[in-house]
């Protein structure tokens, strides 16, 4: 459960990310593919090379979904319902992959914003990404 302090940390961090969210989403996705090669199996139709336009575009989709989640932190299940359906019923993404991408998002954000990435912010973002992952995998059961 996200505390009021967690919500404040997530919102303020996401505000600082601003227009870079799509760029960071693409970088985190590329980092996920490089660090956890099995995640590539869901994207056989993508050019997965460094700097790929397809990876960047999908990373922007990830970032846009997270921006929506930040805006609706008090109703993540409602805000993410369609994405949950897509990933559970159509794409059938292994739930562990959300945790792997979340880790890579944390690393990417820490690399770009080291001064703002305090232990408290790290913990809040980790809890937020975990909450989003839980919602995205809730329909698997």
UniProtKB/Swiss-Prot annotation:
Residues reported to bind O2: 58
Phosphothreonine PTM positions: 8, 108, 134, 137
Classification via Pfam families: Globin
Chain positions found as Phosphotyrosine: 24
Residues reported to bind heme b: 87
Ranges of residues in domain Globin: 1-141
Tissue: Red blood cells.
Residue numbers carrying Phosphoserine: 3, 35, 49, 102, 124, 138
BP GO terms, sorted: hydrogen peroxide catabolic process
Keywords, ordered alphabetically: Acetylation, Heme, Iron, Metal-binding, Oxygen transport, Phosphoprotein, Transport
Entry-annotated residues carrying N6-acetyllysine: 16
SUPFAM superfamilies per the UniProt record, alphabetical: Globin-like (SSF46458)
GO CC annotation, single: haptoglobin-hemoglobin complex
Task performed by this protein: Involved in oxygen transport from the lung to the various peripheral tissues.
Family the UniProt entry places it in: Belongs to the globin family.
Subunit structure: Heterotetramer of two alpha chains and two beta chains.
Protein name: Hemoglobin subunit alpha-1/2
Organism: Mustela lutreola
